[in-house]
């Protein structure tokens, strides 16, 4: 619950590294958020930064550039490159909502992306621990009903009644 002062560096890698170190030192889980927003940073910078556990693979804000463009890769592709390089980073989806009273495709409305965390107790520590262990999934609409994962099987059921349909 302490304020973490941001790095004062103008160098992207240095600023990201210092910010990640400060977040981790304060007991937090560091995430790289909307890396394609204003094309802020990509694989060549992120591969040089250590200590972050998550990358925002999907951001529901219409200006986040999550999908990339003809010249720049999507955040999913950047994530794939980071995983291929050996980094163990988990993906997140968020809505990045800023607009709550008016709904529209060019507005940053809630519910476009989220994570669903599997916990036995609704507490800050339980949620942080589950996220750190990867006991969550990121979604832009699908809700899971049951997930069974063991040495004999992997079974996934989608809760169709709770799953958002496009344009809902």
Regions found by a protein language model. Give the residues of each.
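Active-site neighborhood of divalent metal-dependent phosphoester/pyrophosphate hydrolases
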Residues: 1-7, 57-60, 117-121
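C-terminal functional module detector
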Residues: 85-90, 97-168
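Domain-core and long-helix interface of multi-subunit machines
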Residues: 7-108, 145, 149-156
């Amino acid at each position: 619950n302490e304020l973490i002062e941001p790095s004062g560096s103008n160098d992207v890698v240095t600023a990201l590294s210092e910010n990640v170190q400060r977040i981790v030192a304060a007991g937090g889980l560091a995430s790289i958020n909307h890396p394609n927003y204003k094309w802020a940073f990509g694989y060549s910078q992120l591969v040089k930064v250590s200590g972050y556990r998550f990358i925002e693979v999907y951001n529901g804000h219409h200006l986040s550039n999550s999908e990339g463009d003809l010249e720049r890769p999507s955040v999913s592709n950047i994530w794939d490159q980071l995983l291929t390089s050996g980094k163990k980073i988990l993906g997140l989806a968020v809505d990045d909502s800023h607009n709550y009273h008016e709904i529209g495709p060019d507005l940053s409305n809630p519910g476009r992306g989220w994570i669903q965390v599997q916990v036995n107790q609704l507490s800050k520590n339980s949620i942080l621990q589950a996220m750190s262990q990867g006991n969550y999934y990121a979604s832009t609409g699908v809700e899971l009903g049951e997930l069974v994962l063991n040495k004999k099987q992997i079974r996934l059921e989608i809760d169709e009644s709770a799953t958002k349909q496009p344009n809902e």
